[in-house]
């Protein structure tokens, strides 16, 4: 469901997919090939939330930003996979990342490109992680550097969800 808010109407590419039970609210930009799946909420009522090309927001996720100006926007790069029930708040996610199921990423945090945030991780406010990091725990810490070969497999996850979104689009419209 696309919901305008305070004179901001979500800008959803015709080549993107939004599940009927998902809510895209206010200042949101979804690029080509991106998808927001079932029962997820992307709430751009404080500032812009941008979802990059071929990125997927899986079932039950919440994306929101803070009313504090410095955390009022969110950027999700290209080819990002955000796992089921993740909560992202006022953060920046680099290209090619995998955000694990049930993880929480707080205001002002930056996840470097081609990184993995493990399932259930808690990334506290203001933390910055370098590219190619495996980030796990509560509070989250870098536990190792991932190889470029492993990072390439993350792109495959995003491509797989893009193909699935195309199938949903055919069936559901």
Each predicted region: which residue ranges?
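Structural signal for interior beta-strand "rungs" in well-ordered beta-sheet cores
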Residues: 5-135, 140-142
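Acidic/histidine-enriched, glycine/proline-rich intrinsically disordered or flexible terminal extensions
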Residues: 151-173
């Amino acid at each position: 469901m696309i919901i305008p808010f305070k004179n901001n109407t979500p800008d959803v590419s015709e080549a993107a997919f939004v599940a009927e039970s998902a809510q895209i609210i206010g200042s949101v930009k979804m690029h080509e090939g991106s998808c927001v799946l079932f029962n997820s909420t992307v709430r751009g009522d404080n500032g812009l939330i941008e979802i990059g090309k071929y990125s997927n927001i899986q079932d039950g996720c919440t994306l929101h930003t803070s009313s504090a100006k410095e955390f009022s926007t969110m950027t999700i790069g290209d080819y990002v996979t955000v796992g089921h029930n993740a909560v992202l708040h006022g953060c920046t996610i680099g290209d090619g990342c995998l955000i694990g199921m049930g993880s929480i990423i707080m205001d002002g945090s930056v996840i470097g490109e081609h990184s993995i945030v493990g399932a259930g991780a808690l990334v506290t406010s203001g933390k910055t992680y370098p590219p190619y990091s495996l980030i796990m725990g509560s509070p989250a810490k870098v536990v190792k550097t991932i190889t470029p070969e492993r990072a390439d497999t993350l792109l495959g996850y995003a491509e797989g969800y893009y193909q699935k979104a195309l199938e949903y689009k055919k069936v559901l419209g």
